């Protein structure tokens, strides 16, 4: 048993022309959770049951998890411990949906902080309007044995521009789809929970992509500890920039039922059957103004921010549940072994072979490409049958 103390740190007050507090720490002003091991009596000798949580290096901001060559960065191993009590949370979605912002909040930031203080730097409004993206491949941030993975946007025009093109200067749609499937399939395999972040409650293009990506799996039969082949990844859908109608309980229930129907026959993906656990509706966070730190928030603004932070805290607690073990044996996988598994997935020949066959099928015209995205479900059953 461990004693958990929640320590809340208040922001220092500014007086006169005092400068703002330093923003070196991204979690400044956010709740901090310190897990302390129960003290052992002096006359009791240490036993195998006395567990000391491994220490973890503090990160100030997210770093690249995957390099431009698709390999895992070597420095990541120094950030992980041998603790088996860890949680991997990923976020996918289109450009500008709020993936980086949401992960930053879950990692410890709060709604009153400036964007430059977020551990995952979000795309600026100007860059988003110009269809430019911020995250490249996958970024990672680790805190309190929580591993957060932020994926580059799906179907981003700026990403497609950097991909190989066919003759005539036209976009190679099959390559773009293959790149999206590669990252999505990887995150589905190595994550406990994947957050599907979108401005719409039901993005069919994303759902179709998920149904195809779940079938693109590596073959890691000789990996040790032995992996659980029937493990399911938990999906949580996040509706961002919600309007008043989106917040109605009856509307949320109806939309959750639609999402459950979309994954009722899934073998490796699951959604919660409890109400208000499948679809989380969040209102937009406006850009924080500098004077809010010094003059205080307006009453309505403060109430809205407090409500948002409480909702994030509830989601953070909920994400600790419904975690299925990666391995057959309970708690056999620790953080460092998880990283070894990630490397094996990246290098797995079966996964790459499936992706190449899928890309070849798309190039030959088996797949259908729509102007507003990619339709992935109808022909997937033909391809994988």
UniProtKB/Swiss-Prot annotation:
Positions of the region Disordered?
1-32
Any one Gene Ontology MF annotation carried by this entry is: molecular sequestering activity
Residue spans crossing the bilayer: none
User: What keywords appear on the UniProt entry?
Assistant: Nonsense-mediated mRNA decay
Phenotypic consequence of gene deletion: Defects in nonsense-mediated decay (NMD).
Is Cell inner membrane found in the keyword set?
Answer: no
GO term, biological process aspect, one: nuclear-transcribed mRNA catabolic process, nonsense-mediated decay
Q: Which family does it belong to?
A: Belongs to the SMG9 family.
**Entry function:** Involved in nonsense-mediated decay (NMD) of mRNAs containing premature stop codons. Probable component of kinase complex containing smg-1 and recruited to stalled ribosomes.
State what protein this is by name: Nonsense-mediated mRNA decay factor SMG9
**Per the UniProt entry, what species is this protein from, by scientific name?**
Caenorhabditis elegans
Q: Which gene is the coding source of this polypeptide chain?
A: smg-9
